[in-house]
Amino acid sequence: MTYLSSNQLKQYEDQGYISPIEVLSNSEALKARKEIELIEKKLPNEIDKSGRYNVHLISPKLDSIVHNSKILDAVESIIGKNILVCSTTLFIKNPNEQGFVSYHQDAKYIGLEPHNWVTAWVALTDSNENNGCMKMLSLIHI
C-alpha cells in the first residue's frame, strides 16, 4: 500500500516537493528539541555551528526520527523500498537570529548521481518569517 496519496505523488512529480506531511506530534517535536539542547550542553565543542551533522548517530532519540515510519513510508512511496540515509543535519535558526541560507538545490551539495533520491526536511518548530521560514520553489528539480 502506498503511504502518499495520488495527489501528493503528482505534486512531487510536477513540483519537485511535497508539503506538508505530518510526521511528529507537538510533544514528539518538543522532546527532540530538548534532546538537541541536552547534546549541545554535553558536547559544546563538537556541536557548534559547523558540527551539527549526523547527530542521530549518538542519540537514539534523534535516530528514532530518522527511522520514523511516516518518513520512511513517504520516501518509499517515491523511490521504493531500497532506502539509505546518507546524512542528517541539524539546522537551528532561532527567532531574530542573524544568518541566512540562500536558495539552493540539495543535489548540488549532496553529490550523488543519478538524482533518484530525496531529502526529508523535518521541522521541530514552527517555520515562519520570524525565524527564517523554509521556502520551496516549484519546478527547480527539472
Region annotations inferred by a language model:
Residues 102-103, 130-136:
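A short secondary-structure junction signal
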Residues 1-112:
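Non-heme Fe(II)-dependent double-stranded beta-helix
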Residues 89, 105, 122-126, 138:
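Short, structured patches in soluble enzyme cores that scaffold and shape functional sites
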Residues 111-129:
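Short, conserved beta-strand element in jelly-roll/cupin
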Residues 17-19, 119-123, 133:
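Conserved hydrophobic/aromatic beta-strand scaffold that supports enzyme active sites
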Residues 21, 137-138:
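Residue-level detector of conserved, well-ordered beta-strand and adjacent loop positions
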